[in-house]
Amino acid sequence: MTDLLKRRMSDQRIMGIAIALFLGAVTFVLIVRSPISIWNNSEILTDSSVFEYIAFGMQQGEMPYRDMFDHKGPLLYVINYIGMLIQYYKGVWYIEFIAVYLTCFFVYKTARLNCNRLACLGTVIICATLLYNYYEAGNLSEEYAMPFIGIALYIFLDYFLNRNISKIRLMVCGFTAGGVCMLRPNMTALWIVFSLAVILECVQKKKLRDLSFFILYFCIGFFVLVLPLLIWLVVNNSFTQFIDCYIDFNMIYSTGNGGKEVMLRRWE
């Protein structure tokens, strides 16, 4: 019996390694064409060059929003700053690899909630096929938002399907929401929809104590990521410009005549 158990554990370990390598191979195929790839010497596209320029400015003591204009979230510039510390201009590719790998991993994990391993690997391949051309641009805010979305989707679905929940999971879910808010807030629909579903369920079943528990630990996770970024902006006198560029500017930009209004506003 002991030998059988050891054999099963060994088989599971081998299977886990094989799946990890498979996901790594899929990730590599997805982003090897990225302009910031260490194997690619093609021209970096406009958005990515802006992010890396701001990261370079940060290395010189400048601040996004205050000294350099852009309307993306501060986490994106921090990611590029860390990438440049790893390897000048190319180091962000390693972070990109981790982000895409986590996305693939949680696509697999989410599919595994209701499918066998083979079907889950097929799901990863299908998703990778759909995203293949998209990742060619490289170093986009959506790339870094997707692992946060994948993690949160897994946590929400595991809760609704299997009732698996814990303080850690709630904080991780809040952390992922904070990450997307600090990258690209128009991608937060998943948290809005599923959080409303949880709230409605708790109210309907009169589980208000559970609801307060969920909200508390979700908010803790959210502010673990968001608060340090906001403090960093405040301390460096960039918070007012952050509100102007990231919130006000994007609200105008998202309207029907946003492009014209934005240009007029910037040149008033």
Locate each region found by the language model.
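Short acidic/glycine- and proline-prone juxtamembrane loop motifs at membrane-interface regions
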Residues: 137-145
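Loop-to-helix entry region of an early transmembrane alpha helix in multi-pass inner-membrane enzymes
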Residues: 74, 78, 86-105
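Transmembrane-helix signature of polytopic, membrane-embedded enzymes
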Residues: 98-129, 146-147, 163-168
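Perimembrane helix-loop-helix junctions
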Residues: 4, 190-226, 241
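Start-transfer (signal-anchor) and selected internal transmembrane alpha helices
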Residues: 1-33, 112, 167-170, 213-220
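Membrane-lumen/periplasm interface segments of specific transmembrane helices
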Residues: 214-257
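Membrane-interface alpha helices of multi-pass inner-membrane proteins
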Residues: 169-185, 191-196, 224
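Membrane-interface transmembrane helices that cradle and orient dolichyl/undecaprenyl
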Residues: 112-118, 152-172, 203-205
